[in-house]
Curated annotation (Swiss-Prot):
This is Uncharacterized protein F317L. Belongs to the asfivirus F317L family. Keywords: Late protein, Virion. It comes from the Viruses.
Length: 317
């Protein structure tokens, strides 16, 4: 039987779907404590709020939420997780943050030949970097889907699995593919944590701007109110992945406005700091480099990389 491009595409999308679902299910440490706190004051009959009010935190629980080693540990502490959840929602509701300190601290890393990632917490009301680690790969090494630089999932997970108000990674000054536009892989990986309620946002920091992916609390509440929230998370992430991939294959040049509109349809915001005037600059840059732009890969590019994907899928089974 002759294998058509649609057959190959079907295999590819099925493989991607399995990968997304598996990662969401394995990373989603859902505890009753987390569910009660997230759904508190949001259930129709008040059941979640009533249940949440029954338990009392142990008097020994004096750790601030930033002192826990993992989200899984934090999720078991009612007092500390509620403290985090309250702070998180206050920040997402306002987002009146000054990123000057962060941008100044990151500036020297943007000239490096690799990406960096790390965590940011609020210190005296100001965002401050509390951890930063480099990618083991320099530009051009172990590159997947034609990107110029990458942060491997195991390194990102090591950082993102620790409690923090924000997680970030850099897009260094390496060329047309390393501007402020998040890749589809950036988005799908980030959403695994944001939809769990972990962190207020994920930052993509480049030389010209700080871009933040964030999720409204109502989206998280709707997911957690379901009997099986992890499956809904996996489905939502896969839906967004497929929509972005298909739209990117039809729209050229692909701009930040296109990205922002699609994400908003799913309740996801991509916010630019210091201001949305950056869209003007970024759109002009993408027009200039439209033929070289591969940070968002198209369906055609996905098919070209199918042999690599098949090899990776076979070797991992």
């Amino acid at each position: 039987m002759v294998e058509t491009q649609m057959d190959k595409l079907g295999f590819l999308l099925n493989h991607i779907g399995k990968q997304v679902t598996t990662k969401v299910l394995s990373n989603a440490h859902i505890t009753q404590t987390m569910k009660e706190i997230i759904l508190e004051n949001h259930s129709v009959d008040g059941g979640a709020a009533k249940n949440a009010s029954k338990g009392k935190s142990s008097p020994k629980e004096k750790k601030h939420w930033t002192e826990f080693e993992s989200w899984e540990q934090l999720s078991k502490s009612k007092r500390s997780f509620k403290e985090y959840w309250t702070e998180r929602n206050e920040i997402v509701n306002t987002l009146l943050l000054n990123w000057d300190n962060v941008r100044a601290a990151i500036k020297k890393f943007l000239d490096d030949d690799r990406e960096w990632c790390g965590r940011i917490n609020m210190v005296n009301g100001v965002p401050e970097i509390v951890e930063i680690i480099p990618s083991p790969y320099r530009a051009g090494e172990n590159i997947y889907f034609g990107s110029e630089a990458m942060m491997p999932a195991e390194i990102y997970s090591r950082v993102a699995n620790k409690p923090a108000m924000f997680v970030f990674h850099t897009h260094p000054n390496l060329g047309s593919c390393c501007g402020g536009m998040p890749s589809i892989c950036d988005i799908s990986t980030t959403l695994r944590y944001l939809l769990m309620g972990w962190t207020a946002g994920h930052l993509i920091i480049s030389s010209n701007q700080v871009g933040m992916l964030t999720v409204d609390k109502r989206i998280i509440v709707d997911l957690w109110a379901n009997e099986n929230p992890r499956w809904l998370m996996a489905q939502k992430i896969l839906d967004i992945f497929m929509m972005l991939t298909s739209r990117r294959s039809l729209v050229n040049p692909w701009t930040l406005r296109d990205l922002k509109k699609i994400l908003q349809d799913y309740g996801i915001e991509y916010i630019i700091f210091p201001s949305n005037d950056f869209f003007i600059y970024e759109d002009a840059r993408l027009l200039m480099f439209s033929k070289k732009w591969t940070n968002f890969f198209t369906l055609h590019e996905l098919l070209d990389d199918l042999e690599t994907i098949e090899t990776k899928a076979t070797s991992s089974t």
